[in-house]
């Protein structure tokens, strides 16, 4: 367990607080009444507390990201669509609910930027097999929903880097790109 400390909303909130993003997340985690204090108060323990700003985590993410690129699972393209900053999520027009983010209901804004994408479409058959032929997804009633809503219409490749802000793990082979926060946290 640990904390997910990168992304546009962290960068924005740190700027609003007159702090660097690192100082901002340090205060949230280590400061008085921060995450670590709250865990002690609630008697929560863990084997290892991982912060996504830890050097070893950043190095591991960069290594995995580069390997995925070298294997052809990541390619450079351009993202154009709607973006919800609080959710740190990209959306297509058809996914919006009354023109707003389907997750949080907040306003979205137009976004266009160079980005790297993960070839999720390459793995559609494997994902479908995993869903339909194993007990991977629980409850099982969700299998049809996933297959019909995501697999059959065609899995879209996923945006895995950002260029419109800098608070994140740098893509070491392409300056100006940072690893998208949700990918960064997945490798935790």
What are these regions, as identified by a protein language model?
Residues 1, 56-60, 86, 104, ...:
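Structured secondary-structure scaffolds
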Residues 78-83, 144:
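Short, surface-exposed recognition loops or helix-turn segments adjacent to catalytic cores
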Residues 91, 107-108:
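Cys/His-rich microdomains that often coordinate metals
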Residues 80, 97-98:
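Short metal-coordination and nucleic-acid-contact micro-motifs, chiefly zinc-binding Cys/His arrays
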Residues 92-97, 173:
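Short linker/helix segments within small regulatory modules
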Residues 67, 83, 90, 100, ...:
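The −1 position to Zn-ligating cysteines in a subset of zinc-ribbon hairpins
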Residues 1-74, 88, 129:
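N-terminal Rossmann-like or analogous alpha/beta NTP/dinucleotide-binding catalytic cores
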Residues 73-78, 108-109:
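A short alpha-helix-loop-beta-strand transition element characteristic
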């Amino acid at each position: 367990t640990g904390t997910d400390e990168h992304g546009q909303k962290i960068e924005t909130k740190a700027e609003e607080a007159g702090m660097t993003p690192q100082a901002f997340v340090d205060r949230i985690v280590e400061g008085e009444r921060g995450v670590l204090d709250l865990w002690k108060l609630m008697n929560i323990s863990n084997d290892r507390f991982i912060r996504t700003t830890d050097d070893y985590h950043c190095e591991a993410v960069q290594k995995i990201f580069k390997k995925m690129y070298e294997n052809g699972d990541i390619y450079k393209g351009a993202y154009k669509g709607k973006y919800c900053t609080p959710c740190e999520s990209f959306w297509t027009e058809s996914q919006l609910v009354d023109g707003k983010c389907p997750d949080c209901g907040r306003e979205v804004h137009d976004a266009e930027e160079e980005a790297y994408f993960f070839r999720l479409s390459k793995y559609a058959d494997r994902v479908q097999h995993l869903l339909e032929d194993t007990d991977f997804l629980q409850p099982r009633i969700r299998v049809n929903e996933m297959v019909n809503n995501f697999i059959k219409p065609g899995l879209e490749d996923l945006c895995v880097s950002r260029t419109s802000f800098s608070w994140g793990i740098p893509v070491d082979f392409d300056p100006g790109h940072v690893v998208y926060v949700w990918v960064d946290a997945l490798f935790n």
